[in-house]
Amino acid sequence: MFEELRPHLIELRKRLFISVACIVVMFIVCFALRSYILDILKAPLIAVLPEVAKHVNVIEVQEALFTAMKVSFFAAFIFSLPVIFWQFWKFVAPGLYDNEKRLVVPFVSFASIMFAFGACFCYFVVVPLAFKFLINFGLNEDFNPVITIGTYVDFFTKVVVAFGLAFEMPVIAFFFAKIGLIDDSFLKRHFRIAVLVIFVFSAFMTPPDVLSQFLMAGPLCGLYGLSILIVQKVNPAPKDKESDE
């Protein structure tokens, strides 16, 4: 059994090595440009709360260095995503038919675009609104906000990556439909459960306020509907199966 899996494990190791190597190279580049990247990350806070943004602090000796490394890794991961998606496709492509292999460019492009769309939606809409709501709530309670660069970067990267990955839902649905794991009737049948899972996922991945949760859950429900339409084109349920339901 191991001998049968050996070629696949070797191929998996190769694809992982290329992906990690790309991230390492991009990390070095991004670390050299960390000041510019950090300015981009702070822009949403500056846009809505400029006075608060002037007083972002460092309270631990190692915090500045660790934050610079986190920012660099975050940017390196984002820039490496097209390569990571490409390597994933190259790993699964040998098990596909020739006509399915021609989907490699659309798959990588679609996956990259959807992640970028989710990250941009979070950057331009969710992060500014969430920060304004949360910090103003504290100010209204007579609390003095003391924001450290480490906590800001942790918050920012968590929600941006969460939105980017969440927006991959149509891509994942397309892939599962293409290999025959799901059809449109499956998604329609589990719609209510999916909405519940979306709201639970949003509650875990967003700040603890209702606004941020709905800003994630709303688009995801829409993307679930888009996934149904995509799967309906890629792997529609048989007519007799639909009539039974």
Swiss-Prot record:
Keywords: Cell inner membrane, Cell membrane, Membrane, Protein transport, Translocation, Transmembrane, Transmembrane helix, Transport. GO terms for biological process: intracellular protein transmembrane transport; protein transport by the Tat complex. GO terms for molecular function: proton motive force dependent protein transmembrane transporter activity. Signal peptide: none annotated. The keyword Ion transport does not apply. It comes from Campylobacter jejuni subsp. jejuni serotype O:2 (strain ATCC 700819 / NCTC 11168). Part of the twin-arginine translocation (Tat) system that transports large folded proteins containing a characteristic twin-arginine motif in their signal peptide across membranes. Together with TatB, TatC is part of a receptor directly interacting with Tat signal peptides. This is Sec-independent protein translocase protein TatC. The gene is tatC. It is found in: Cell inner membrane.
